[in-house]
Structure formats: structure tokens, C-alpha cells
Amino acid sequence: MKLVIVSGRSGSGKSVALRVLEDLGYYCVDNLPLPLIGSLLEQLKGSNDLVAISVDVRNLPEQDKVLVKQLTSLPEGTELTSFFLNSSDKVLLKRYSETRRLHPLSKSRVSLQEAIKLEGKLLEPLSQQMDHYIDTSNLNIYELSDQVRQILLGSVDKELVINFESFGFKHGMPTEADFMFDVRFLPNPHWEPELRPLTGLDEPVAEFLNRQPLVNKFIWQIENLLETWLPHLERNNRSYLTIAIGCTGGQHRSVYVAEQLAKRFSNGKHKVNARHRELSHAKA
């Protein structure tokens, strides 16, 4: 089992790091008291091999040796990785002033600036025990996400799920599409009597469309467009990308084009799905 502990000063980006871990398949728990880590891992054994928890100043033991004992008494086979996120007092003060959130150590007689300094002092021993120290003072959320992925995966890229969806314009456009392409200008198998009752999944329709230079050129251009911009989309904290392909009825052209694109991107670099909305509705 892999366990990732994320700690750091409030406002330094712990929630961003947890979101990255969640996208990577980790079971995430926010602000779990350290004495409960062992029991949590025992309960998740066999069902979740990736676990991440965040620890802040409110759930730390008062003595450093207690923390060390808790981290060294984890269940056998636990692979531990830890992060400590920090920012300068000036940056943290600015972030809290902008969001107007209450600092965990803020009290009626303690100013925000004093609370920030106190937290830094309390967390200093913990910061010395963490595997990875990240100063987020000059990082935006995307740069921080990249650093966390780089440490865990050895790469800033994460697995992007690409969904190719065919649809018919006469049945309405899909609302969840990131890109939408209209293929109604392509040669239409509907006007071939023997092809009309078939779909873009059937071999005769596929052969008909594959013989059309315009169809092949269009597929190539969409593939080239997506290949060019996919690396940038992956670094923009995306988990899913939906490309909708539409023709008139959603039976022939859009189905074929979506299938061809799905095959071209099923090269092991991404998880690819092909969904045909109107064909699914017909089966239902």
C-alpha cells in the first residue's frame, strides 16, 4: 500500500496537492488525526492501495517523538511518501487577505499575521521530517500540480481520459463537449440504398467512407489538431476531454469518424472511449 502524507502551512496549497492525488486514484482524507492513520490503513487494506491524508497544525501531537513513533509504526508493507508545502509569511498574509478565510490558529486576541508566524513555528519540526519540501510562494496551482505529479510519477503529465462521442444534430448537441466537429459536409452513406439501414460501425459503411479522400483528410486534420494541443491540455489539470462529432442523424458519418479517431489515439498513452449517442438510444 502506498501512503502519501501532505502537510504544510495553511494557505500553502495542501488542498491543491490533495486534488492532484485524488485525480491520480488516491483515496484522500483531509485533516485526519495521526493516531487514526493505522486503523484507516487496516480498514482500506485490499480495497484501496493508494491512500493520501493531509495533516495540519490542528491534528499534530504535542511532542515530536510521538509523531516519529506514529510514522514508524505503520502497517507492514506501507510505502510512505510525504510532502511539506510552505510559503513566505508575506504571501500567506496576502492569500488570506484576498480569500478572507479564517486561519486555523486565529483567535480573538491573535492577529492574522501572528497566527501565520505561530503556525510556522509549530510546524518547523514536522517540515524537517518530510521527504519533499515545496515552496509555493511563486507557484500557481498548475505549477504546484505539475511538481506533485513530477515527484510521484516522474512526469508532469497525467493520464487524460479522451472521450470521442458521435451524435446527430437533429437530436440536439451534447452539452459536455470540449471540442465539437460538424461532419455534415462529408459524403453521406444515407443516400446509398444498401447502406441506409446500416451504421458507421458496419464494414460496408466503413469501406464507403474510407474511399472518400475528403473523409480521410478531415480525420487526419482533427488528429493533427488534437496531437498538437493535447500536451498543453494535459498540463491544464484536465482529467477528461470530450470530442463530439456530429452529422445529421448520428448513424453513419459521425460514428465512423469517432471510431477512427478513437483507434488512432488508442496507443497506450491515453485512456480512450468511443460512445455513439444515437446508437445507444436506438438500443434502449
From Swiss-Prot:
Domain of life, per lineage: Bacteria
The reply to whether Nucleotide-binding figures as a keyword in the UniProt entry is yes
Tell me the residue numbers annotated for binding ATP.
Answer: 8-15
Task: Give the residue range of the signal peptide.
Answer: none
Q: What does this protein do?
A: Displays ATPase and GTPase activities.
The protein's matches in NCBIfam families, at most eight in alphabetical order, are given as: PRK05416.1 (NF003828)
The entry's protein name is Nucleotide-binding protein Shewmr4_0670
